[in-house]
Swiss-Prot record:
A GO BP entry: DNA replication
Annotated spans, Disordered: 194-217, 476-555
Pfam families: PH1_SSRP1-like (PF21103), POB3_N (PF17292), Rttp106-like_middle (PF08512), SSrecog (PF03531)
Species name: Kluyveromyces lactis (strain ATCC 8585 / CBS 2359 / DSM 70799 / NBRC 1267 / NRRL Y-1140 / WM37)
The keyword Transcription regulation is annotated on this UniProt entry: yes
Gene: POB3
Keyword Secreted: no
Lineage, broadest ranks: Eukaryota, Fungi, Dikarya, Ascomycota, Saccharomycotina
Function comment: Component of the FACT complex, a general chromatin factor that acts to reorganize nucleosomes. The FACT complex is involved in multiple processes that require DNA as a template such as mRNA elongation, DNA replication and DNA repair. During transcription elongation the FACT complex acts as a histone chaperone that both destabilizes and restores nucleosomal structure.
Molecular function terms from GO: DNA binding; histone binding; nucleosome binding
Biased composition (Basic and acidic residues): 194-209, 541-555
Name of the protein described by the UniProt record: FACT complex subunit POB3
Length: 555
């Protein structure tokens, strides 16, 4: 007869389920909640009795937790038990599996240093014999030596079998001081956490007994030793011989450097001199293959989500640069039977072509993403991009069939479906700005604007025509200003009907001010102070009489 427990959470899942202990093993199944899609994603767990290695009981997030260490399937966590369930579980494991249920208490002192035990399925950080926290190896996605004595651990946030509720940790750094001499006893190593570096208090790292130690040929830092040991335990660094295909010394503009690329069945690893990155195929959303405007290089852009990280910097785009005529000859590292079964319709057995074409074809086959290439747009100089600047960065804007792509730093991708309008304007009236214009992209849902400046005026008509062909709303501020000016001056009417208000300069006939009456006193004053006043008046009358009369205005 089996023993059941309800409202138990498997590996910190969002949904509870039923946990069952039986003679042949144990299992878990998510509770049905109206047939929701989230329930369907939680596959039932079945574990044979001979697969269980050890079991532990401790406090958890939702009560008490049962931690099951397996021989080949990593670590299993069952959370949500009540305190009174301990005796029942202890008796069941003893009776059914002949196994002791170990009760472990966590250290709650809050110290950031202690002993680090690289156990079979998890990394345990403990203080005074009590664990402070545990990290299963399956949750560690990558590790890097960020400094001489510093190691960064990056956690896997894309594991489909791990669905935590709420926020989760994405990175942790450890400070590991000291060095290792040749033939030095490696059983206990001093290490401390990054945040404790100022305290000067050291802790220890302890490796599992019987683990194979690497041959030390020269002095190395404890950080290097710990880094290699962790990679071995967590299987972070796949064996290069298992890679389906590899490319050597490829140049990346983002993140900048040269990296070797090893492509595996479900993941890709970038190996540089200082940093290594690992990304799953499912992280790649888009693949772009574009010629650079210098006609010498070719660019390949990978849009990835979630982005890879380097400290506080995240990289949502990976940008590779190739020589345009660079060629590669490579063969897939798979057996013929495996190729016929898995890759025949996706890849070629052997490649001999330009490097960017080979890499794009391989990525397309393994990820299932299509390769986006330049569309129908051509600039005045028959290129697929226009030179411009974004803020203080100069680059090139690629008008693709369905989006804008700005390269290279920062890389910006703006789908046309997210654009509300495009404004074309000049930044000023100087001689320099008269030869260029700005392209302002207004996003939908009040998500702000993005401005690409200093685009050559020669490209305006071609770019405007292209955008209108994509059913985008284009607003030319210069043309609208000119139309408003013409409307203000009535330029749309015939010349004969134009009657522009020009003030007194436009009067055709003289008008008499009826309110003004000249007096004799004015004449007397003129004669008194100007002896030629009368002569001037008479001359004025003479000249006035000699002036030709104006022609009558034709109606």
């Amino acid at each position: 007869m089996s023993t059941d427990f309800d409202r138990i959470y498997y590996n910190q899942s969002k949904l509870g389920g039923r946990f069952r202990l039986a003679e042949g093993g144990l299992g878990w199944k998510a509770s049905a909640t109206g047939g929701s899609a989230s329930t369907q994603n939680n596959e039932p767990l079945l574990l044979a009795a001979d697969e269980v290695s050890s079991v532990q009981w401790s406090r958890g997030c939702r009560g008490y937790e049962l931690k099951i260490s397996t021989k080949n399937k990593g670590l299993i966590q069952m959370d949500g038990f009540q305190q009174e369930d301990f005796n029942l579980l202890k008796n069941d494991f003893q009776r059914r599996f002949n196994m002791q249920l170990e009760h472990r208490e966590h250290s709650l002192r809050g110290w950031n240093w202690g002993k680090l035990d690289l156990a079979r399925n998890e990394m345990v950080f403990s203080l005074n014999g009590k664990p402070t926290f545990e990290i299963p190896y399956t949750h560690i996605n990558n590790t890097n030596l960020t400094a001489k004595n510093e190691i960064a651990l990056e956690f896997d946030t894309q594991n489909e079998a791990y669905n935590p509720a709420g926020d989760e940790l994405v990175e942790m750094r450890l400070y590991v001081p000291g060095t290792v001499e040749e033939n030095e006893d490696q059983d206990q190593i001093m290490v401390k956490d990054e945040a404790e570096a100022e305290d000067g208090v050291k802790s220890e790292v302890k490796t599992e007994e019987g683990s194979e130690e690497p041959d030390v040929q020269e002095e190395k830092t404890l950080a290097e030793y710990f880094y290699e040991e962790l990679r071995s335990k967590a299987d972070i660094g796949e064996i290069s011989g298992d890679a389906i295909i590899s490319f050597q010394d490829l140049f990346f503009t983002t993140p900048r450097g040269r990296y070797d690329i090893d492509i595996y069945k479900n993941s890709i690893r970038l190996r540089g001199k200082t940093y290594e990155y690992k990304l799953q195929h499912r992280q790649i959303n888009r693949i772009f293959s574009l010629p650079k405007a210098d006609d010498i290089h070719y660019l390949m852009v990978l849009s990835i989500d979630p982005p890879i990280r380097q400290g506080q910097t995240s990289y949502p785009f990976l940008v590779l640069q190739f020589q345009k005529d660079e060629e590669t000859e490579v063969q897939l590292n798979v057996e013929d039977d495996e190729f016929e079964k898995l890759y025949k319709d996706k890849l070629k057995k052997q490649y001999d072509a330009k490097t960017h074409i080979v890499l794009s074809h391989v990525l397309k086959g393994l990820t299932g993403r299509r390769v986006i290439v330049p569309g129908e747009y051509k600039s005045k100089y028959d290129q697929c991009a226009v030179s411009c600047s974004y803020k203080v960065n100069e680059g090139h804007l690629y008008p693709l069939d369905n989006a804008f792509l700005f390269l290279t730093k920062p890389t910006l991708y703006i789908p046309f479906q997210d654009i509300a309008a495009v404004n074309i304007s000049r930044a000023g009236q100087t001689s320099t700005s008269a030869r260029t214009f700005d392209l302002e992209v207004v996003m939908r849902a009040n998500r702000g604007t993005t401005t690409f400046a200093n685009i050559s005026k020669e490209e305006q008509q071609l770019l405007e025509t292209f955008l209108r062909s994509k059913n985008l709303r284009v607003k030319n501020e210069d043309k609208e200003a000119e139309q408003r000016l013409q409307t203000a001056f009535g330029s749309d009417s015939d010349d004969d009907d134009v009657d522009i208000n020009m003030g007194s300069a436009g009067e055709d006939e003289e008008s008499v001010d009826e309110d003004f009456h000249a007096s004799d006193e004015d004449d007397d004053v003129a004669e008194e102070f100007d002896s030629e006043a009368s002569a001037s008046d008479s001359e004025g009358e003479t000249s006035k009489s000699e002036r030709p009369s104006k022609k009558a205005k034709l109606e």
